[in-house]
Amino acid sequence: MDEIINKYQAVEKLFKEIQEGLAAYDQYKTLISELLHYNNHIKQEYFNFLMIISPYLIRAHSGETLRNKVNNEIKRLILVENINTKISKTLVSVNFLLQKKLSADGMKTKNMWCTNNPMLQVRTAHNLFKQLCDTQSKTQWVQTLKYKECKYCHTDMVFNTTQFGLQCPNCGCIQELMGTIFDETHFYNHDGQKAKSGIFNPNRHYRFWIEHILGRNSEQELGTKQDPCGTKVLQQLKKIIKRDNKCIALLTVENIRKMLKEINRTDLNNCVSLILRKLTGVGPPQISESILLRGEYIFTEAIKIREKVCKKGRINRNYYPYYIYKIFDAILPPNDTTNRRILQYIHLQGNDTLANNDSEWESICMELPEIKWKPTDRTHCVHFF
């Protein structure tokens, strides 16, 4: 957390140095205005980050026992929210802006960016501007900021209220308008329709399914108004097990799903892991928080890539347990038999659907360096009880 705060403060200080260094030169007024946009943006990101972690900081000071838990939660937020990536993207944009202006002013920039550190690249560009300013005389002409002109193809941009900014009709580039409020009509009910959130959050789906796959969901989900604790359901399942002479220790996810279908309780398919734990006394593995966080990050990236590469015309909804299965199958070592038991608690769909999912997953893996593609192997049902 301290590292992120220091990074935000260092970026703000660097932006301030650049603006102060160019303020005396009239020919750079347009550039300063453009840099101000990124300066405001990084300040807003810094403020948002502090707002996110502030409740956890308050909890951390309330007791020693909560401190480790709070620190882990803040680390998870930093990873999931891609804080480092957001800072780097802003620095890359600023570096591109400076490099473009330097090239326009006749300064050779080729081969000057030999580092992958965006912070160092921006500082290098700043130093080059100092050299350029020393060799040029101050001029008094004034430029006007053409904020509606696309910086890539110089086409007039149009307002796009869904993206909260200007969009180029030619290349599709979007320029965010900081501090501008649009009519948010999509947040109001029309003709009795239910208002929906316009923000898709893959992390919420990941946490929901991980909670259910690991059997950490509430036991009240098994119940009804007449049977709050789900005792009746468990009794019905035990009768079927006894009738069919099934070995409780060898029960699988597919066994439980078939029995739930028989008693017309397929609404409990999401609770199979919890039911298995109640019946067998053996639950899913308790995977460490670091592995779960890594899985959450890869899951988020995979869903984003899927939205870009998904096959046209395919209307099937995302089956998120499949993604979780593929991720943990890839990141858990083959000899880690304890944690790999999680694969036994994930239901895989039919062969045709699985083949389609594997084909789509192969396309995702091409843009996901963390995962190496391989076809799904159904022989994971080897028991380690």
Curated annotation (Swiss-Prot):
Keywords: Late protein, Metal-binding, Zinc, Zinc-finger. GO terms for biological process: regulation of viral transcription. InterPro entries: Poxvirus_VLTF3 (IPR007031), VLTF-3_Zn_ribbon (IPR014900). The keyword Phosphoprotein does not apply. Induction: Expressed in the late phase of the viral replicative cycle. Coiled coil: none annotated. Belongs to the asfivirus B385R family. It comes from the Viruses. A zinc finger (C2H2-type) spans 166-190. This is Zinc finger protein B385R. Disulfide bonds: none annotated. Pfam families: A2L_zn_ribbon, Pox_VLTF3. GO terms for molecular function: zinc ion binding. It comes from African swine fever virus (isolate Pig/Kenya/KEN-50/1950) (ASFV).
